[in-house]
Amino acid sequence: MKMKRYYSFLLLGAVLSCAPTKEEPVLDKLPYFDLKGFIDLEINELEGDSVLKISEINGEKQTQELRYTVKDWKEEFASFYQADINVPSLVTAYDTRTTPDQLIHELLPEAKGKVKEITIRYVQNYPAWVMFRIKDENMFYQSTTLGELFMNQVTGKIDQYKLETTQKVMFLSPTHIKISGVIH
């Protein structure tokens, strides 16, 4: 009798575990600049290109000449992907301003979000410069990241990028990380 009851609960658990999960809704129209889509589009153009990469951690520099695949570029630009703000929970969280050559998304003071600002500068209606600021903090940890991406106006491809991060964990010294790359 106990075995029969055990198998009944096991079967019920298996059936319930197969129930469809609630997925995050997909936005019909993106409310903000499509940073993720832009990066995806641009890194496909960089397949096999080489980059002179300078990494600096707490003042210690390392310079490398590297050749990246699309997968490598996606990893290199992970911070840019993290700065994408086109998610349903942030649909009303940003103030959007425009000038003749810029689009600026800035987190509203009462809104919660890690991405504080995204600025896109346009030349001939195409992004020439993209910048984002991320700040994440809690009682034990604080992190700020500034990212910039520059487009070559002649080739129409990503020309340079910069990432600067400062991480501070309670009771430890801050870690300063700078990464820059010149693509050729």
Residue ranges of predicted features:
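Surface-exposed acidic loop/strand-edge motifs in secreted or periplasmic proteins
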Residues: I43-Q124
